[in-house]
Amino acid sequence: INMPENHDTDFNWPDFVERVNAELIAAYGNFVHRVLTLGNRLPESTPLHSFEDLSYCTEEITKLESLHVQITSSLERHRFKEALRFSMNAAQLGNQMLQNATPWTYLNDLTQDGSKESMAKLSFGWRLCRYLAITMQPFLPFSSEKLWKMLGENGCLLYTSDAADDVLC
């Protein structure tokens, strides 16, 4: 992440392209795409939120709460590179969670052993996408607003109060 916080920085296009591809698309974009695509593949009679069971996601919630404290602290200290890095860590956490849960293996038969935990993780992935829309808003305002709408949220993301705290509960 190249930002002039404490000193000048050198900008070059190859580094910019590599960072966009390696960080934004590979971590953030991939995670959001996976959650939205897998959620869309569910039967219409079974919405994603019906699988929510946070008891399966305590480890992820703990990690996300820690990242939230770090993101908030970084933003309060005007350490934007650091805050962005922690936000990207939340996207990586989501990717790892989905990779381990393999919810795509249960989409055709939601009664299989292990499907309840796996689908609970996918449902938590939706919460995490909502959290990413909120925390990435200072860095990607237009994309965050688009994601906010794709998640079915009403109103303008910028004027949503305490939205990040709501995601963690």
Q: Predicted regions: what is each one?
A:
Residues 1, 8-12, 85-86, 140-142, ...:
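Short coil/turn segments at secondary-structure boundaries
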Residues 1-53, 154-158:
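Catalytic adenosine-cofactor/nucleotide-binding cores of aminoacyl-tRNA synthetases and other
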Residues 2, 67-69, 130-132:
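Short hydrophobic "helix-edge" motifs at membrane interfaces and signal-peptide entry regions
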Residues 11-24, 66-85:
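Extended, non-catalytic structural segments that build the interaction scaffolds
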Residues 20, 24-27, 31, 56, ...:
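Amphipathic alpha-helix face/heptad-repeat signature
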Residues 32-71, 91, 95-115:
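Conserved, charged catalytic cores of large soluble enzymes
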Residues 73, 77-79, 88-161:
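Basic, alpha-helical terminal appendages of large translation-related enzymes
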Residues 159-169:
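Single conserved hydrophobic/aromatic residue that forms the stacking wall/gate
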